[in-house]
Amino acid sequence: MRILHFYRTAFPDTMGGIEQVIHQLALGASQSGIEVDVLSLSSDKQIKSIEFNGYWTHRAHLDFQLASTGFSLSVIRQFSRLAKKADVIHYHFPWPFMDVVHFVTGVKKPTIVTYHSDIIRQKELLFIYRPLMNRFLGSVDRIVATSPNYRATSQVMVRYSDKTSVIPIGLDKATYPKPSQDRMKYWSERLGGKFFLFIGVIRY
């Protein structure tokens, strides 16, 4: 089996939450004997496909970015080529240009969308994008919500509840960076023996 993940950014170019999810899925699948390709955009001038921790990452040149949406003409051809070899295509939402690529290339493979987030900041542009978004989400085979609460409260996902499944994001603890004992002692003395630290990409 061969899986193609498609999103606007990915390791090793950028380090964020969705990138980490894609990496963990690709890593886990490759360790189970599944061939995995990850396709994303990059502003790097030296673009080439590289093997990364057991799976292949492919990058197309980022032509320009508008309202957090990356655009690339060359990615259309790359996606078409990789999609022909794939058994399953795994999209990561939201990325409006991804929807365009999906329809332009005429994908005929089983398709999954992991729905990571509603569109929050670009609500004015959502009015323009909504018809394409609904057509895209309506065309894929399955949608994955990352929590039961998200599936129940997202106005977009409620519309597609009949083909939405909940699969919580799982992370391999073995890949966590190990904190130094000095730093752990420092924070334990200030916060107590047990505490949570949440870190993510600061986008808004």
Question: Locations of the language-model features?
Answer:
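Acidic anion/phosphate-binding donor-loop and adjacent secondary structure
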Residues: Q155, G170-W187
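A short beta-strand/loop micro-motif in the catalytic core of glycosyltransferases
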Residues: I89, G138-P148, S165-I167
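An aromatic- and histidine-rich active-site surface loop
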Residues: S74-I76, V88-K108, I120
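A short, histidine- and acid-enriched strand-loop-helix "catalytic/donor-clamping" loop
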Residues: A67, P96-F97, T111-L126, S139-R142
